[in-house]
């Protein structure tokens, strides 16, 4: 069984809630998902819901409340206790910080410092029995500061690509089928910059599969 462990920030929920829902509902017996929800994530989503009337944030909070549903058999969710942040020293974060990085970690606002604390806790301090945790974020600044502190991070698209393959997702199967058809009907060549390209005959054009339905017309 393959296991994936993700720390999820607010931007991942707000911009990729549909993807996260699909991961949970499509999770097969061959894949186990562990989600860690930091205090930062809950506070940010609550702020976006209350102050900016974000529909995505509101739906994300509702979804998080339902994640302990028994129908998500291969999913484990860990909601961070705020008290955890009090036991993590800032020096623990700075120990992993690359001082040559672009971001002055010491001058970050407290909420971002708390996110770093949560990530350092899961990645390095907690007894994880060999588990490797990855931060999912759609915020370039957060991914940059995570990289500077040696915290593995990725985007929704990155995770989607990996999980679609492991869960044998329909979109992955169709994409793989399309790629195989391209290889069959084309010729592999190498471009001037060293990239591999597939050259096809116009008369053997292959179109990617589309969903069923009627073509809309005005």
Curated annotation (Swiss-Prot):
<dbReference type="InterPro" id="IPR002716">
    <property type="entry name" value="PIN_dom"/>
</dbReference>
<dbReference type="GO" id="GO:0005737">
    <property type="term" value="C:cytoplasm"/>
</dbReference>
<keyword id="KW-0866">Nonsense-mediated mRNA decay</keyword>
<keyword id="KW-0963">Cytoplasm</keyword>
<dbReference type="GO" id="GO:0000184">
    <property type="term" value="P:nuclear-transcribed mRNA catabolic process, nonsense-mediated decay"/>
</dbReference>
<dbReference type="GO" id="GO:0005634">
    <property type="term" value="C:nucleus"/>
</dbReference>
<comment type="function">
    <text>Involved in nonsense-mediated decay of mRNAs containing premature stop codons.</text>
</comment>
<protein>
    <recommendedName>
        <fullName>Nonsense-mediated decay protein 4</fullName>
    </recommendedName>
</protein>
């Amino acid at each position: 069984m393959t296991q994936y462990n993700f720390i999820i920030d607010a931007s991942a929920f707000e911009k990729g809630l549909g993807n996260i829902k699909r991961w949970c509902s499509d999770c097969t017996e061959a894949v186990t998902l562990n989600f860690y929800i930091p205090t930062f994530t809950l506070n940010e989503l609550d702020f976006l819901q209350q102050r900016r009337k974000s529909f995505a944030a509101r739906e994300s909070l509702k979804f998080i409340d339902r994640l302990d549903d028994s129908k998500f058999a291969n999913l484990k969710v860990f909601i961070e206790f705020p008290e955890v942040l009090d036991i993590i020293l800032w020096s623990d974060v700075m120990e992993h910080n690359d001082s040559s990085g672009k971001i002055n970690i010491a001058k970050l606002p407290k909420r971002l410092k708390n996110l770093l604390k949560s990530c350092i806790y899961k990645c390095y301090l907690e007894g994880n029995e060999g588990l490797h945790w990855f931060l999912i974020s759609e915020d370039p600044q957060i991914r940059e500061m995570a990289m500077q502190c040696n915290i593995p991070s990725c985007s929704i698209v990155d995770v989607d690509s990996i999980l679609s393959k492991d869960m044998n997702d329909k979109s992955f199967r169709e994409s793989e089928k399309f790629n195989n058809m391209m290889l069959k009907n084309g010729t592999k060549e190498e471009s001037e910059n060293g990239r591999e390209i597939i050259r096809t005959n116009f008369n053997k054009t292959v179109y990617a599969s589309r969903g069923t339905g009627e073509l809309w017309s005005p």
